[in-house]
């Protein structure tokens, strides 16, 4: 009996030893680790990497309300509610802090992903040259857009090297200080302009949330408008010029002198967007309008004759008037979801959903 017991104990100890040996054999856990070359020579993995760069536009970088189920319609600043009511009020009044939105970290994660993509996409030969150019332009747009989101919230921010940072470097080498507001805007402007060269004017329905040429040029114009505004382009009599916002060397990060050229440049950039060619009276974008009708249907009343002002009321839409449109339905359709995203001539860039918190 004792021999049987010893034999049983021996077998159990051997089994445990084998199991422990398997546990300690860590080689199998490294089989799933892939090099950048492995990722960017595989088409599916390449697209997954770009999708991950996009992903940080959600979460903490979604800034308004929580209308999660209305992805095809807009909502104006009048509407907010649900379980994010207090958070949205905080955003509206500018009283939020980093405990409310951790977009700093998420944005720089997206910037890193996009930069790596830009540096490595050219090694993938499974795409045509045109496809690679589009994908690289998307990543360039996304990276510049993260910087734009950061600039709006934090003011002057650190601009990282395009090739990234070596995390094994000393802290002093990794601690990139803020660039000036003008430097940030110039970077965003140049990157958006470069991205616009290879982005298409339109996207297919299944790619409606990807940036177009108009999206890049519009973000560029917005950044230039912010740079031209009093916050960074003060007139002599402006009381607060943010002169105490300086870098480690004491250089002021905000412009201290008014420059009229900034407004001219912003206006020209906005015009670049407005004059993009398209199928809306020769333009890519225009205000959505619904034709007037005298037929009433459930939920859709007949057109109420608009105010007769003797000018616009006598002209058609193409002539700059409103005699042949339904003003009420033209406005309502944009907000109630009856107008799909891809059909909306006003839509320049969307993240694929209307509003939404996490």
Name these PLM-found stretches.
Residues 1-31:
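Bacterial Sec-dependent N-terminal signal peptides
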Residues 21-84, 157, 214, 225-358:
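An aromatic- and glycine-enriched ligand-binding surface/loop that stacks and positions planar moieties
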Residues 38-61, 65, 80-154, 171-208:
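Conserved, well-structured interaction surfaces
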Residues 156-163, 196-206, 281-288:
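Glycine- and aromatic-rich loop/turn segments at beta-sheet edges
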Residues 161-166, 192, 227-229:
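Short, small-residue-rich loop/turn micro-motifs
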Residues 162-168, 240-243:
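Short, conserved phosphate-binding/catalytic loop or strand-edge motifs used
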Residues 209-219, 223:
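Amphipathic alpha-helical protein-interaction segments enriched in hydrophobic
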């Amino acid at each position: 009996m004792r021999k049987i017991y010893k034999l049983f104990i021996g077998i159990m100890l051997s089994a445990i030893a084998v199991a422990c040996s398997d546990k300690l054999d860590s080689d199998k856990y490294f089989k799933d680790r892939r090099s950048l070359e492995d990722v960017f020579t595989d088409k599916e993995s390449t697209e997954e990497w770009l999708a991950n760069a996009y992903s940080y536009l959600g979460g903490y970088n979604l800034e308004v309300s929580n209308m999660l189920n209305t992805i095809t319609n807009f909502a104006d600043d009048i509407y907010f509610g649900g379980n994010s009511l207090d958070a949205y009020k905080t955003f509206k009044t500018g009283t939020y802090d980093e405990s409310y939105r951790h977009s700093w970290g998420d944005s720089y994660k997206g910037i890193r992903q996009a930069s790596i993509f830009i540096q490595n996409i050219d090694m993938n030969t499974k795409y045509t040259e045109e496809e690679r150019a589009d994908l690289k332009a998307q990543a360039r747009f996304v990276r510049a857009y993260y910087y734009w989101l950061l600039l709006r919230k934090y003011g002057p921010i650190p601009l990282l090297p395009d090739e990234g940072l070596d995390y094994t470097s000393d802290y002093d080498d990794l601690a990139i200080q803020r660039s000036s507001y003008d430097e940030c805007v110039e970077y965003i402007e140049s990157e958006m302009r470069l991205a616009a060269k290879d982005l298409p004017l339109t996207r297919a329905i299944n790619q409606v949330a990807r940036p177009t040429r108009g999206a890049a040029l519009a973000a560029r114009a917005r950044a230039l408008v912010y740079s031209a505004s009093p916050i960074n382009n003060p007139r002599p009599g402006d009381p607060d010029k943010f002169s105490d916002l300086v870098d480690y060397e004491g250089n002021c990060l905000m412009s201290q002198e008014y420059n009229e050229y900034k407004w001219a440049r912003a206006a020209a950039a906005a015009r670049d967007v407005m004059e993009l060619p398209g199928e809306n009276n020769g333009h890519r974008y225009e205000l959505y309008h619904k034709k007037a009708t005298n037929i009433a249907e459930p939920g859709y009343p007949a057109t109420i004759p608009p105010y007769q002002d003797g000018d616009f009321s006598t002209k058609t839409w193409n002539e700059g008037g409103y005699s042949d449109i339904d003003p009420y339905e033209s406005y309502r359709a944009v907000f109630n979801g009856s107008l799909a995203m891809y059909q909306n001539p006003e839509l320049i860039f969307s993240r694929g959903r209307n509003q939404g918190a996490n």
